[in-house]
Amino acid sequence: MPIKKPCLKLNLDSLNVVRSEIPQMLSANERLKNNFNILYNQIRQYPAYYFKVASNVPNYSDICQFFSVMYQGFQIVNHSGDVFIHACRENPQSKGDFVGDKFHISIAREQVPLAFQILSGLLFSEDSPIDKWKITDMNRVSQQSRVGIGAQFTLYVKSDQECSQYSALLLHKIRQFIMCLESNLLRSKIAPGEYPASDVRPEDWKYVSYRNELRSDRNGSERQEQMLREEPFYRLMIE
């Protein structure tokens, strides 16, 4: 006599209901796109921001000799096996995540030490919105290396809100900070370096350029350039 097997039927309808009730997680970039107009209008309501310039800052030859030292709240690290000198704020002002947004500053090779002297008061400023940055040790790179002819400074931007978002105030401070860096270099008649093919910049930026390192690569391309120019963070910096 054949044994009757129980009829087991999986109720897929109930699974579909559960799945449909789970909200789709937006990426940090998508959230920034969705909030673009709000942030754009809020940024324009803030007055000009004036950064307190740090005093008693090290010069370029000093940081090339340091191994690890604390200066103006920044830990400076210079390892012999690295072509970069790294600076990281001990108590970060922005508590969010790094979502790939960064700036390069490109200087003529022979003027990098002077450019550092001009910018160091801002880079070490307690008002600086940049918690982490690095600079090329020019003694360790070849004449024509990518970070020898340009992109000697890298400024890393961190978010300050939940879900890796930026507040309008932080975006405003970053915009103003970039303007100060540019104007200080221009006023001192520093010669620009070769800005990276991987980056984008508006016509009025002579030294600073932008890249999101999570959605681009170092080689660059027309497609990548177009994509970076459409990045909401970049647009909020220049528009």
UniProtKB/Swiss-Prot annotation:
Name of a matching Pfam family: VRP3
Name the Gene Ontology molecular function terms of this record.
Answer: lyase activity
Subcellular localization, as worded in the UniProt entry: Secreted
Question: Which Gene Ontology cellular component annotation is one that this UniProt entry carries?
Answer: extracellular region
The active site consists of H104 (proton donor), K134 (proton acceptor)
Q: Which residues form a coiled coil?
A: none
Which EC numbers characterise this protein's activity in its record?
Answer: 4.2.3.-
Principal EC category: lyase
What are the entry keywords? Answer: Lyase, Plasmid, Secreted, Virulence
UniProt-listed Gene3D superfamilies: phosphothreonine lyase (3.30.2430.10)
What does this protein's UniProt record list under function? Catalyzes the removal of the phosphate group from the phosphothreonine in the mitogen-activated protein kinases such as MAPK2/ERK2, MAPK3/ERK1, MAPK8 and MAPK14 in an irreversible reaction, thus preventing the downstream phosphorylation of histone H3. This epigenetic modification results in inhibition of the transcription of a specific subset of pro-inflammatory genes, and ultimately to a reduced immune response against the invading pathogen. The diminished immune response enhances the bacterium's ability to disseminate and multiply within the host.
Name the family the entry cites: Belongs to the phosphothreonine lyase family.
Q: What is this protein called?
A: Phosphothreonine lyase OspF
Q: Which organism is it from?
A: Shigella dysenteriae serotype 1 (strain Sd197)
